[in-house]
């Protein structure tokens, strides 16, 4: 049984930051490259997010990212040529769970980073806008039938630019529950940041009211740490 689910709103001092939709003037581009150590220090830690967050029991596969399109699609591989810096955390409880997967792909130059982001954008552009998945019961998984909507938004924050794939999953009425996911892919200089936040609610058929603000604040906190 899940043991710790705090309020859906994230309680962190860092969450004053947020991502814009491109209307604000971005900060000027830096002249130098961003180091892997800089990204390692910029990624949020459990203590930055809230007291109920912790590292997951299972370590993530460093060669794969989180799923971008959702549904039954497989997660894309990490675009080649980068040093991977990652940090993942979960907040689990009786009413649901939250997850945060942060991956920084640090390339040797800006051109390689742009190519890496383009590869991930190609995956996102192939996502279906509406998905219906029947109930699944296997030795490893039991999941009720659900529908999921997918949309892509443009992002521009503090000199970082890219996109976010926003997914809303809703389970069949006899198994009420939702899963709201945002996968942000942003590039600045030689770095591609893939930041995925998800909130899962049990016995609740409504989207979390704090979801839209929370994922933007989490991403904004990281990019503003880098500058």
Where in this protein do the model-derived segments appear?
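Core hydrophobic alpha-helical membrane-spanning segments
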Residues: 11-13
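Bacterial signal peptide processing site
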Residues: 20-23
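A short acidic/glycine-rich loop-to-helix N-cap element
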Residues: 197-214
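Post-signal peptide N-terminal segment of mature Sec-exported envelope proteins
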Residues: 28-50
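A small/polar (G/S/T-enriched), proline-flanked helix-loop surface module common
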Residues: 53-182, 210-226
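C-terminal motif of bacterial Sec signal peptides marking the signal peptidase cleavage site
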Residues: 15-18
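Bacterial N-terminal signal peptides that target proteins for export
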Residues: 1-9
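Short, well-structured beta-strand
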Residues: 175-202
